[in-house]
Amino acid sequence: MPSKKKKYNARFPPARIKKIMQTDEEIGKVAAAVPVIISRALELFLESLLKKACQVTQSRNAKTMTTSHLKQCIELEQQFDFLKDLVASVPDMQGDGEDNHVDGDKGPRRGRKPGSSGRKNGGTGSKGKDKKLSGTDSEQEDESEDTDTDGEEETPQLPPQASHPPAHFQSPPTPFIPFTSPLPLPPAPPGPSAADAEDEEDYDS
């Protein structure tokens, strides 16, 4: 049986591209082939950007591509000059041992982000959900920058968590100990006499 070549069919959605194009008032009708061609051009552009960024990452002996690697790639390649504004706020790479430093820097940042420490019981878990719902990467970057700077501002939010009702702990049940008093008990009152019992029977009948 001959082996079938699997057709590479992953593309940027042409309908979305057409919608973006039509937001420009100067563009009227768009031929069906145009968004498809732009979709393929986007793929080729991303492929070249990621290959260059991958080379930068590997040259640093890093296992994870970071925004700093992308920034260096964009600054080194003249064809990516138009992207420099996007990465202007990204921190520069540090020396050859940068992988260890960057990973070390990320650890404490994660610790300061809301909802990541063990003491907070998901009080700010909704922020993580909001990130998934945001539409563009730039919105996500803005939100991530906000969460980085809000780390110090999050500490005043501890008192609302203290407003939860305090936990009530029950102590283990104590064994029954019969009461023994050092004082003598008074004599028991006399019980009902036989005559009283007969009177009570009369009332019952």
UniProtKB/Swiss-Prot annotation:
Disulfide bonds: none annotated. GO terms for biological process: negative regulation of transcription by RNA polymerase II. Residues 138-155, 196-205 have a biased composition (Acidic residues). Phosphorylation reduces DNA binding, but has no effect on heterodimerization and TBP binding. InterPro entries: CBFA_NFYB_domain, Histone-fold, Transcr_DNA_Rep_Reg. Residues 14-77 form the Histone-fold domain. Keywords: DNA-binding, Nucleus, Phosphoprotein, Repressor, Transcription, Transcription regulation. The keyword Signal does not apply. Residues 98-108 have a biased composition (Basic and acidic residues). Residues 172-192 have a biased composition (Pro residues). GO terms for molecular function: DNA binding; protein heterodimerization activity; transcription corepressor activity. Residues 91-205 are annotated as: Disordered. It is found in: Nucleus. The keyword Transcription regulation applies. GO terms for cellular component: nucleus. Pfam families: CBFD_NFYB_HMF. Its main location: nucleus. The association of the DR1/DRAP1 heterodimer with TBP results in a functional repression of both activated and basal transcription of class II genes. This interaction precludes the formation of a transcription-competent complex by inhibiting the association of TFIIA and/or TFIIB with TBP. Can bind to DNA on its own. Heterodimer with DR1. Binds BTAF1. Belongs to the NC2 alpha/DRAP1 family. This is Dr1-associated corepressor. It comes from Mus musculus (Mouse). The lineage of its organism: Eukaryota, Metazoa, Chordata, Craniata, Vertebrata. The gene is Drap1.
